């Protein structure tokens, strides 16, 4: 999945070894909570840049992946920042850049209500570098939702 702006991750594969749920819209990327309870949500997102960085990131640029409840009220449930190399060699070099390839892992437990809708999002937060989500070597993206109670 090639992206360069903030977006919801869509177009999921649910064939073996992955699995589907009647609550998951793999095309739109939305999971609708079937029953009120406690849920474990996990995601592993591999990525790679599609071009070399030519400038340093600004201090406020912190791209991330977020599992967000989009309905009934938009709420970030868990987020993970991209790994950033932050180098400052006095009077010579000040560099801040995302790694060319990396992995962001998200995990948490949440009290959710039947009918809540959640999705996995890329939040660019000022990053304009094109990304290949899933990584250059097809390591992929996996996210799962499990009811605990």
Feature annotation, model-predicted:
Residues 1-149:
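Extracellular jelly-roll beta-sandwich "head" domains, especially the C-terminal globular C1q domain
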């Amino acid at each position: 999945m090639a992206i360069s702006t903030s977006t919801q991750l869509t177009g999921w594969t649910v064939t073996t070894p992955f699995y589907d749920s009647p609550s998951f819209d793999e095309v739109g990327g939305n999971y609708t909570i079937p029953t009120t309870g406690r849920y474990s949500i996990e995601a592993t997102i591999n990525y790679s840049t599609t071009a070399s960085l030519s400038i340093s990131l600004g201090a406020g640029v912190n791209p991330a992946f977020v599992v967000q409840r989009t309905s009934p009220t938009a709420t970030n449930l868990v987020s993970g920042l991209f790994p950033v190399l932050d180098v400052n060699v006095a009077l010579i070099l000040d560099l801040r850049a995302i790694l060319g390839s990396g992995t962001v892992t998200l995990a948490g437990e949440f009290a959710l209500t039947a009918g809540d809708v959640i999705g996995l999002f890329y939040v660019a937060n000022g990053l304009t570098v094109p990304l290949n989500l899933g990584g250059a070597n097809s390591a992929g993206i996996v996210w799962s939702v499990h009811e605990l109670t």
